[in-house]
């Protein structure tokens, strides 16, 4: 088990398990998975293909909501991506999941929560699909406003707190994990971004953990047609 930071909280030291959905499509699953990998937190992965057979019952055996992701930590069940990240930050305070500086940490939590709660137009119009060839989609006014706000967040965080590295707050943090699926969406749908945003996206995409997730996603056999927008005009990569 990586780390022993939970000793004072009475947490068990059984191996953590992270229940996730398809790596090609499940943006919510990607967030804690990526954070745990980058932070060096050991865990077992339980992947349940979404919309495949009796997937809901399979998820309910782990998660009370019937949704992914869900972190199993001994007798604890922690669901919702942001709640999982907060739990991990408490469990492993030495792993840098949030910035050490108080002002940066408050900002990181704010933008992570905004990502968790908002940007519904981008979610609907540009579903995460790593196997989709790069091809643009026309943005609705709502989606364009979402994109503008994301770019403003990235710019502000980088300008104010990003001097120590290529990520939003310098070093990789939970905030970057929350925005990583947006990076994939902007790449997949060829969303126009400025030079600074492009550099940030490249930094996220260069992470070994990101590359490992994407490589696994491209090998998955499952297809969720609702996420295959412009199908069959834009054919999924095999």
Language-model region placement:
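Phosphate-coordinating loops and pocket residues in cytosolic domains that bind phosphorylated ligands
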Residues: 61, 206, 215
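Acidic/histidine-enriched, glycine/proline-rich intrinsically disordered or flexible terminal extensions
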Residues: 217-238
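GST-like fold's C-terminal all-alpha helical module
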Residues: 119-211
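GST-like domain detector, emphasizing the conserved glutathione-binding G-site
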Residues: 8-140
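Conserved beta-strand edge residues that scaffold enzyme active sites
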Residues: 50-52, 200, 218
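A short, structure-level motif marking secondary-structure boundaries and short turns
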Residues: 16-19, 70, 168, 185-186, ...
């Amino acid at each position: 088990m990586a780390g022993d930071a939970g000793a004072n909280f009475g947490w068990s030291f059984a191996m953590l398990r992270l229940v996730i959905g398809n790596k090609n499509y499940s943006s919510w699953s990607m967030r804690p998975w990526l954070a745990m990998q980058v932070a060096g937190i050991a865990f077992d992965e339980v992947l349940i293909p979404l919309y495949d057979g009796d997937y809901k019952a399979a998820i309910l055996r782990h998660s009370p909501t019937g949704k992914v992701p869900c972190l199993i930590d001994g007798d604890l069940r922690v669901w919702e991506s942001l709640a999982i990240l907060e739990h991990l930050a408490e469990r492993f305070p030495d792993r840098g999941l949030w910035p050490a500086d108080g002002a940066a940490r408050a900002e990181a939590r704010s933008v992570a929560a905004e990502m968790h709660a908002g940007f519904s137009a981008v979610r609907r119009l540009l579903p995460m699909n790593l196997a989709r060839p790069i091809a643009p989609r026309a943005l609705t006014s709502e989606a364009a406003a979402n994109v503008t706000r994301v770019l403003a967040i990235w710019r502000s965080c980088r300008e104010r707190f990003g001097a120590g590295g290529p990520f939003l707050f310098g070093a990789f943090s939970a905030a970057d994990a929350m925005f990583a699926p947006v990076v994939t969406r902007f790449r997949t749908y060829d969303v126009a971004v400025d030079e600074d945003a492009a550099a940030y996206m490249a930094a996220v995409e260069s992470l070994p953990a990101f590359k490992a997730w994407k490589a696994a996603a491209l090998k998955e056999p499952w297809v969720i047609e609702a996420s295959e927008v412009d199908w069959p005009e834009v054919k999924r990569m095999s």
